[in-house]
Amino acid sequence: MATQLNDLPDVILSNIIAAVTDVRSRNSTSFVCRKWLVLERSTRVSLTLRGNVRDLFMLPTCFRSITHLDLSLISPWGHPLLSPTTPDPSLTAHLLHHAFPFVTSLVVYTRHPFTLQLLPPLWPQLKQIKLVRWHQRPQLATGDEFNMLFENCPNLSSLDLSTFYCWTDDIPTALVSHPMVASNLVTLNLLNPCFSEGFKTDEIKAITLACPNLKEFRVVCMFDPRYIGFVGDEGLVAVATNCPKLSTLHLADTSALSNSRGDINDDGFTQEDAKFGVSTLIEVFSGLPLLEELVLDVCNNVRDTGPALEILNKKCPRLRSLKLGQFHGISMPVESKLDGVALCQGLESLSIRNVGDLNDMGLIAIGRGCSRLAKFEVQGCKKITVRGMRTLASLLKKTLIDVKISCCKNLGAAYSLKALEPIQNRIQKLHIDCVWDSVEEFENLDGYGYGFDLNRRDGCEASSNFGDTFGCEEDAYLFKEKKRCKFSYDLNSLYEEVNGHGNGYSGRSWDRLQYLSLWIGVGDLLTPLTAAGLEDCPNLEEIKIRVEGDCRLWSKHSEQAFGLSTLLHYPKLSKMHLDCGDTIGYAHTAPSGQVDLSLWERFYLLGIGTLSLTELDYWPPQDMDVNQRCLSLPAAGLLQECLTLRKLFIHGTAHEHFMMFLLRIPNLRDVQLREDYYPAPENDMSTEMRADSLSRFEAALNRRPISD
């Protein structure tokens, strides 16, 4: 009789099950037999609780090995988990400790400071904590909340405040007051879009001076020189001087964290220059030799940065990920000589935004020099065209699997997809803007481009055919005995001649594409997506669509539906993020000649019931004047038609009556309202947000029999 998996010794079987990280797979494993159930429960180390805090009798007690516990999504979402007004808060805290005694990493929604008083002391071995809050900061003295936290967590090594609203001066005040805790920190994440002005130079100096052992530091800064205390030479040098052990450094301007798309006609240059230059960058890079991941996302001009990036390559040999915003002169090749970021040959991920002087030649140089790139993002570069992008894709066709092209004037949807044809059978993640190029312009474009040989070494060309731009006699000498592959980059054809035999990209299938992200302007349709070049994506599983614009500038839309039925071309599509949160309109009665947001929701959701979705995240459009993002009646009616849904998360509010529509979805297991945007509404007495209303809906949902 053949040996079965269940015949393995318990120790080996336990190690196998412990190695499975996917939650659904672990749950399936636990259903095999009671023995596997016990092993799965005893080896799970991470858990996210989603039940209602009122149902403490349902708190699981079989996960005794949990070390990472996420309490931020407990229902009702955003309501205080522990506060003086909740019944028996101490009992709730002790029951959590009894169920999960070995927690070392905690995520918790902290709307009331009472949560920080009760929870952290229960786990003295707590080392990592992430605080979540989208509501207003409570009226406390500066730094009081963090003083509570640091007093109760002396062994803290990681603090994540990227989704926690507070004041910027709360943090340095508390860190300076607790030097032992601050010196133990190795990870600090302050990359929070809620900080409207970001951290100033004095605050960054105080934070880095108090935390000399940081290895990962992410912070939102104020680089704009028009503001008092802006971050310039002094602030950047302080980071490198005070925290020399950094392996991950993210410095981003406040405006860089916003979701809003820039002006496609912008030339990439701002009126003001940043108040730091190449010499400062060289000093910073020289002081951080252990850097592996660097983000410098500035919103003011940083000019002539090529020499600094060459020093970055020399001083930081471990660098693998780089993101630059508003940096100019990053790649300005002269003849065959690479420069700037193109010399960072160890990079595996590169993101560039608003590089005003980057052209096709610079883009090609990046493709030649950064030959290990698996991820490439370009945003707001108006001088690059389909020819340069297509050449880069061809140069990186063995490694590139993740691409984002956004807000580039010459790269709309069809042009972007045309440029990526050389890697269309390899790419796994893709973002494009749904700017539908003129069909006539696209078809009539002259079929000329850059033609050159790709016999190269260390980024240099071995072809005299490429003229003075990329010729390299040394490589020609080294490779003259090798097979020569000549590529010609044409908008209408791409072919490879190997000893005279063609091997082109005639198919249109994106075989490995699993994730697709789209930006689309308000009022535009999704229907041209397949005609633009994405008609065949057999393995596409997840799509994210972000709609942005002001509905108030539109009268009635001419078409009945946005075009979600177009996605029926993708047979494996099961997860969708439909983000209309940046769509602005009238929540109530609209002026004559215009329509309110309920009709816009119907426009965008019509046809969603035809898709076989199992998971949906939906952000309703908003009325900024009244800070309202509420699910409308047409939206609730259309969502109830999604008969295959198992998970539905609405990032806004909804009336209880409309929520009850969702009970008609037969296999729906998990529904939640999340106001995870700032500022989250404070009025808990409205019918859209009342805790009792949400609890009644969840109780009705849990009473239904589910087939599996």
UniProtKB/Swiss-Prot annotation:
SUPFAM superfamilies: RNI-like
Keywords: Nucleus, Ubl conjugation pathway
Keyword Phosphoprotein: no
Annotated knockout phenotype: Increased shoot branching.
Domain F-box: 2-49
Any one cellular-component term (Gene Ontology): SCF ubiquitin ligase complex
Tissues with expression: Mainly expressed in fully expanded leaves, lateral roots, axillary and shoot apex, and, to a lower extent, in internodes and nodes.
GO biological process, one term: SCF-dependent proteasomal ubiquitin-dependent protein catabolic process
Location in the cell: Nucleus
Function comment: Component of SCF(ASK-cullin-F-box) E3 ubiquitin ligase complexes, which may mediate the ubiquitination and subsequent proteasomal degradation of target proteins. Is necessary for responses to strigolactones and may be involved in the ubiquitin-mediated degradation of specific proteins that activate axillary growth. Targets probably SMAX1A to degradation upon the formation of an E3 SCF ubiquitin ligase complex (ASK-cullin-F-box) containing MAX2A and KAI2IA in response to (-)-germacrene D in the stigma.
PANTHER family in alphabetical order: F-BOX PROTEIN MAX2, PARTNER OF PAIRED, ISOFORM B-RELATED
Assembly information from the UniProt record: Part of a putative SCF (SKP1/Cullin/F-box) ubiquitin ligase complex. Interacts with DAD2. Interacts with KAI2IA in the presence of (-)-germacrene D.
Protein name: F-box protein MAX2 homolog A
The species this protein was found in: Petunia hybrida
